[in-house]
């Protein structure tokens, strides 16, 4: 049984749009826009502002579970913020290693970290240590910064760090949102890790959905850009 998931889309998929899309039906769960973690533990109001679904059992009005995404590069502060987030009982916690925005990347966030598999492992391990085993813990990544040379290394580092599932957007940071998405590389990553993989990128139609499943070997698809 395949799942259809709603991607986090900064500047686009806010709580209003998430509510509209999930009201249509068909989404199994989604991820909110990222919450940036720097050198402090954020106040509860920050989490609730970016993901107001936390005030409603971490679900949209239609009942779709909404997970919370953290973005940052310091394992210590990522773990401290995850610890606070756990107290708000989110539907799950996701780590952002996929955002290609220059403003984010300049501050060592998102896809800019894909050249450092060891750091990805350190972040995932630190967060895993504070997230309950019964709370879904995932990460979302791209295929690399300028090329796909470290795609498998990054995926394996995150898997070894203890995430439950990995979402892979089939583009590099340099690719931005330009088509095509490299589905064949998602399949290579899937074959290299032992955890479930979710495919993301350039799925616009039912035909795209089926073809993406066939080319990646992934049953689950995340819809975004």
Language-model-derived ranges and their functions:
Residues 1-225:
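Flavin-dependent oxidoreductase catalytic cores
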């Amino acid at each position: 049984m395949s799942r259809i998931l709603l991607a986090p889309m900064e500047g686009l998929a806010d709580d209003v749009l998430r509510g509209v899309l999930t009201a249509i039906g068909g989404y199994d769960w989604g991820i909110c826009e990222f919450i940036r973690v720097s050198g402090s533990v954020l106040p509860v109001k920050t989490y609730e502002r970016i993901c107001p679904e936390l005030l409603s059992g971490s679900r949209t009005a239609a009942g779709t579970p909404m997970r919370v995404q953290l973005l940052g590069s310091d394992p210590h502060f990522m773990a401290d913020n995850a610890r606070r987030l756990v107290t708000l009982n989110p539907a799950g916690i996701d780590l952002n290693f996929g955002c290609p925005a220059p403003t984010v990347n300049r501050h060592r966030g998102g896809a800019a970290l894909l050249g450092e598999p060891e750091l990805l492992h350190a972040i995932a391990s630190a967060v895993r240590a504070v997230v309950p085993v019964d709370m879904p813990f995932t990460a979302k990544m791209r295929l690399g910064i300028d090329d796909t040379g470290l795609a498998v290394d990054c995926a394996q580092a995150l898997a070894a760090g203890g995430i439950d599932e990995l979402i892979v957007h089939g583009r590099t940071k340099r690719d931005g949102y330009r088509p095509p998405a490299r589905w064949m590389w998602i399949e290579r990553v899937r074959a290299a890790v032992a955890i479930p993989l979710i495919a993301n990128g350039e799925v616009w139609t039912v035909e795209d959905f089926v073809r993406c499943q066939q080319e990646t070997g992934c049953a689950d698809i995340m819809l975004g850009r």
